[in-house]
Amino acid sequence: PVGETTLGRISNVLGEPVDNLGPVQSSTTFPIHRSAPAFTQLDTKLSIFETGIKVVDLSAPYRRGGKIGLFGGAGVGKTVLITESINNIAKAHGGVSVSGGVGERTREGNDLYMEMKESKVINEQNISESKVALVYGQMNEPPGARMRVGSTASTMAEYFRDVNKQDVPPFIDNIFRFVQAGSEVSALLGRMPSAVGYQPTLGTEMGSLQERITSTKEGSITSIQAVYVPADDLTDPAPATTSAHLDATTVLSRGLAAKGIYPAVDPLDSTSTMLQPWIAGEEHYDTAQGVKQTLQRYKELQDIIAIPGLDELSEEDRLTVARARKIERFLSQPFFVAEVFTGSPGKYVSLSETIKGFQMILPGELDNLPEQAFYLVGNIDEATAKAASLQAEVQ
């Protein structure tokens, strides 16, 4: 079953509802195995898709109608980031989305469902007004179901793209579990494993799923996919094969998560094909490069700071370190979906506000403010207000 009747409902790989709300009343059904759109139908327009998350919009902006991967090891915040993206996109862009839970924890699937009800993305009183369709094939399902649930989610998204001519963001959490399920099926079929024990058909399987998640001239599919990185090794065949298909990669760093900087996105490791002066604009490009240069220099100085200490640095380097620490903290942001843990209300920061903030930090206009003022705030005005209140507390 596909179409509007799937919105607000949770289905399994066969399209059967698993939310105890009765059958899905849909007259339209699509097969889950469908071919990718022809090359001539693909959309080639380049424009930036604003997420309202500072570090993403600045350092590795997403392409409207592109494919995005969130890479990270265990417990660095992939699911929170993907849930925040669903929340922001549903509110700011107002479209429908499809969320595919591929081999992840049932608890996370349940949490996501409850959060969506709270934030009215799923409307319990009037299900037809919901903004998202959920497709789950969780960890306890057999490998065949986990391997195919991605195709079911793609099929639902394709209906909104091809029939309703809508822009749809499908979210997939987690692509690694799709590969893992494929590896289990491969072993059951008695195939000889290839590198690191993965299936020999890894590239083909990944291609057949990824090639379908694409934008055509009818409507766009901006997909956001979480990719678990086994043992924090980005060269592992699963994340490496995935990144070949993506327009932007958002890499989460354990080091930043340990410092308490959330979202723990590493601007130096994250990449995007959209960060070009002729696409993003000179101003955005120059600001992003300036931020990256400052952070890179700070990274190079870490060894000196760790042993002889800050006093051994030149005056110029000390300034760089101070600004880099402010930038690092300003890249953190309170999330709507994490209000429960952080205790501070979530913030959506527009791209222009983000650029304005970093343009003030880089040349040193805000050198007199303490670095705590930049931690977990929205735009730069909130940082200056926080600095003033910190100052008042001291006095």
UniProtKB/Swiss-Prot annotation:
Produces ATP from ADP in the presence of a proton gradient across the membrane. The catalytic sites are hosted primarily by the beta subunits. This is ATP synthase subunit beta, chloroplastic. It comes from the Eukaryota. Transmembrane segments: none annotated. F-type ATPases have 2 components, CF(1) - the catalytic core - and CF(0) - the membrane proton channel. CF(1) has five subunits: alpha(3), beta(3), gamma(1), delta(1), epsilon(1). CF(0) has four main subunits: a(1), b(1), b'(1) and c(9-12). The gene is atpB. Its main location: plastid. One of its GO terms (molecular function) is proton-transporting ATP synthase activity, rotational mechanism. Its EC number is 7.1.2.2. PROSITE patterns: ATPASE_ALPHA_BETA. It catalyses: ATP + H2O + 4 H(+)(in) = ADP + phosphate + 5 H(+)(out). ATP binds at residues 72-79.
